[in-house]
From Swiss-Prot:
Ubiquitously expressed. This is Putative gamma-taxilin 2. Belongs to the taxilin family. GO terms for molecular function: syntaxin binding. It comes from Homo sapiens (Human).
Length: 131
């Protein structure tokens, strides 16, 4: 995957994005004689540039990919570590569920709809094999 190639370069990409935003800010400071509207426009363009060109790679994805790339690290962890890793995986899955639930709740307009969605999700989680 393309994201796996970026894992080792995450810090460098952050530094690059930060340096580009710093260059944009320096450019704004050098044009002090311009009107304030021009500064606002440049500031918005700078934010758009940073937002469009920055992509985040999940640290979880990076660690999983690095384990696949390095076969000598594929030694089975002791049972205590397996239980800990299993709990972490459950937390990650539940965290994603919570995020999706919050996004779904934000799309609903009435409190009744939100309550019904929460009750349905609670029932679904009660039947889930994760718990």
């Amino acid at each position: 995957m393309e994201e796996a190639g970026l894992c080792g370069l995450r810090e460098k990409a952050d530094m690059l994005c930060n340096s580009e935003s710093h260059d944009i800010l320096q450019h704004q400071d050098s044009n002090c004689s311009a009107t304030s509207n021009k500064h606002l426009l440049e500031d918005e363009e700078g934010r758009d540039f940073i937002t469009k060109n920055r992509s985040w790679v999940s640290p979880v994805h990076c660690t999983q990919e690095s384990r696949r790339e390095l076969p000598e690290q594929e030694v089975a962890p002791p049972s205590g570590q397996q239980a800990l890793q299993c709990n972490r995986n459950k937390e990650k899955v539940l965290g994603k569920e919570v995020l999706l639930l919050m996004q779904a709740l934000n799309t609903l307009s009435t409190p009744e709809e939100k309550l019904a969605a929460l009750c349905k999700k609670y029932a679904d989680l009660g039947n889930s094999p994760l718990l």
